[in-house]
A protein has these predicted regions:
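C-terminal beta-strand-rich structural cap/linker in extracellular carbohydrate-active enzymes
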Residues: 520-547
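Sec-dependent signal peptide recognition
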Residues: 1-7
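Loop/helix patches that line or flank the sugar-binding groove of alpha-linked glycan CAZymes
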Residues: 42, 260-266, 278, 287, ...
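Alpha-amylase-like alpha-glycosidases and glucanotransferases acting on alpha-linked glucans and related
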Residues: 37-47, 51, 149-243, 250-365, ...
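C-terminal motif of bacterial Sec signal peptides marking the signal peptidase cleavage site
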Residues: 13-14
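N-terminal structural segment of carbohydrate-active enzymes
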Residues: 24-140, 145-147, 152-156, 162-163, ...
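Structural recognition of the beta-strand scaffold that forms the well-ordered cores
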Residues: 46-49, 91-96, 139-140, 230-232, ...
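Solvent-exposed beta-strand/loop surfaces of large extracellular or lumenal domains
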Residues: 506-527
Length: 547
């Protein structure tokens, strides 16, 4: 049942009529957000980000495509939790699949079609059907802040036709630059239009209600007629400008609040995750019933830096801020994405660090995202094309990606770092991803349990308690960020949600008893795991079992 009252709908209609002018006329509606039902399936998901062009080529043209993803679904999740040949992810984020003049697709020319290099709408619907049969959700990249300058809307706007005010025009070039000092006003036909990223990506004018209505109808199309499970929304903080204030404006936040109500009216389970590339405190308002959640960039930096610098201080403080800032678990976690140097490159090709990063990512709270190829140690350093290279499937010609020359050169390390090789090794990067994905999927405490930092006598240990009262399960997760083995590990918590009693610490990866703890009535414990050694860049996943 969808709980949206008639009064709420009338309020939205009235607000929409008032939202056709400049940005200062857009204000947040007064609505009872508690009356909006949501179905947060993403809290139980492990996402996998795919650049379709680089995943798998099914038709020998050197370009990855939708049929290629279909052919590789059993690698991602074969639908059988008892097998160990699939990775085990439960949701896909597809980078842009709309028609576009660029290889990356972030400048759209048609919001209701599929890039012909990737396939057809029927191919995409077949992918959704096949994915759903395996328990995999499908989320698509929606680039709504701007279009291509080749989009029919913009060509009509530039020629002073009916869609002039679908974009932002000025007869004289404003004097200000963009948020990072870039040119944002671009000349066309003796006028200037606004494009925060570059001239080939003109920003849409969301103070025009016609634009908002068109985008809402487009989202409805992809949900109701095509069947997607959600959207990753690009560049959410740039939606509406107020003069030279070009990020995080009040009008932008108001627009997203209105869209949230619309989104949940389509389907309580329709997910929207936002890219707001900014600090935790600036991200937080977008996650407050405007989008379901946003990506946590600061945490990704803290995670990689913590491993490289062998200290828990940044991770400890960042997790403390996150826990106090967001609604429980409502943030996306990741190592790196398609806009950043790949994590294996950041770790200097140290496999131990790559494995440790995977274990931390998959045992922390939040909604984890894996960038394709991360699980096999793909390398990549900017420019962007080089962090989006073809997937490394095998050591054979073209890395098993295609039977012909790929659209972009392969990484040199594909002969050793590929799916086929790593699936044969029990201690490979791939194996660590698979093992910890499955542990997360099987254990509610690792997906949605409480998080409490575990103090230690060693700043190179990053440890925490994940506890779930409903399933009555808890885990102590202990990571050694150091390049040295660590003995006699002290673990200490002053209070937690644990009930009083004595618990054995069982390493669920090998069923070994690692000792015990005595928990007080406040949930506190303090013990030393004597005669226990945690190897460099290694982890313990200890289940607390009452004795």
């Amino acid at each position: 049942m969808r709980f949206i009252s008639l009064l709420l709908l009338l309020t939205l209609i009235f607000c929409s009529k008032e939202a056709t002018g400049t940005s200062d006329r857009i204000s947040e509606t007064t609505i009872n957000l508690d009356n909006i039902e949501t179905d947060p399936w993403w809290n139980d998901a492990v996402f996998y980000e795919i650049f379709v062009r680089s995943f798998y080529d099914s038709n020998a043209d050197g370009v990855g495509d939708l049929q290629g993803i279909i052919q590789k679904l059993d690698y991602l999740n074969d639908g059988n939790p008892n097998t160990d040949t699939d990775l085990g992810i439960t949701a896909l984020w597809l980078m842009p699949i709309f028609p576009s003049p660029s290889y990356h697709g972030y400048d759209v020319t048609d919001y209701r079609n599929i890039d012909e290099e990737y396939g057809t709408m029927n191919d995409f619907k077949a992918l959704i059907t096949a994915a759903h049969a395996r328990g995999i959700k499908i989320v698509i990249d929606f680039v709504g802040n701007h279009t291509s300058d080749q989009h029919p809307w913009f060509t009509a706007s530039a020629s002073n036709e009916s869609k002039r005010d679908w974009y932002l025009w000025n007869s004289n070039k404003p004097s200000y630059n963009g948020p990072w000092g870039q040119e944002v006003w671009h000349e066309r036909n003796n006028s200037y239009y606004y494009g925060v990223f570059w001239g080939g990506m003109p920003d849409l004018n969301y103070t025009n209600q016609e634009v908002t209505n068109e985008i809402k109808n487009t989202l409805r199309f992809w949900k109701e007629e095509v069947g997607v499970d959600g959207f990753r929304i690009d560049a959410v903080k740039h939606w509406i400008e107020n003069g030279d204030q070009q990020e995080n404006t009040a009008a932008t936040l108001a627009w997203w609040r209105d869209l949230y109500v619309f989104q949940k009216s389509l389907d309580p389970g329709l997910m929207m995750v936002g890219e707001a590339w900014t600090s935790t405190q600036n991200i937080a308002p977008y996650s407050d019933k405007r989008l379901d959640y946003c990506f946590e960039f600061d945490l990704s930096y803290a995670l990689i830096d913590g491993i490289n610098n062998q200290t828990n201080s940044g991770l400890k403080s960042k997790m403390s801020e996150i826990i106090s800032t967001y609604e429980t678990n409502q943030y996306g976690t990741f190592l790196t994405n398609h806009d950043q140097d790949r994590s294996f490159y950041r770790f200097g090709m140290d496999e131990r660090k790559a494995k440790l990063a995977a274990r931390i990512l998959l045992s922390l709270p939040g909604v984890p995202y894996i960038y394709y190829g991360e699980e096999v140690g793909m390398l990549g350093q900017k420019p962007d094309e080089d962090i989006r290279r073809p997937m490394q499937w095998t050591s054979s010609a073209n890395a098993g990606f295609s039977s012909t020359q790929p659209w972009h050169p392969l990484n040199n390390n594909y002969v050793n770092y590929n799916v086929a090789n790593q699936q044969l090794e029990s201690e490979s990067i791939w194996s660590q991803y698979q093992i910890w994905i499955k542990q997360r999927t099987r254990n509610t405490a690792l997906r949605s349990g409480n998080y409490d930092f575990i103090e230690s006598n060693n700043s190179r240990m990053f440890s925490y308690l994940r506890a779930d009262s409903e399933s009555n399960t808890a885990f102590a997760v202990i990571h050694n960020l150091s390049s040295q083995n660590t003995d006699d590990i002290t673990i200490r918590i002053n209070n937690s949600s644990l009930t009083e009693g004595t618990y054995n610490l069982i390493n669920i990866l090998n069923n070994q008893n690692m000792g015990s703890i005595n928990v007080s009535s406040s949930g506190a414990f303090d013990t030393t795991l004597s005669e226990v050694t945690l190897a460099a860049y290694s982890s313990f996943l200890l289940k607390l079992e009452g004795s």
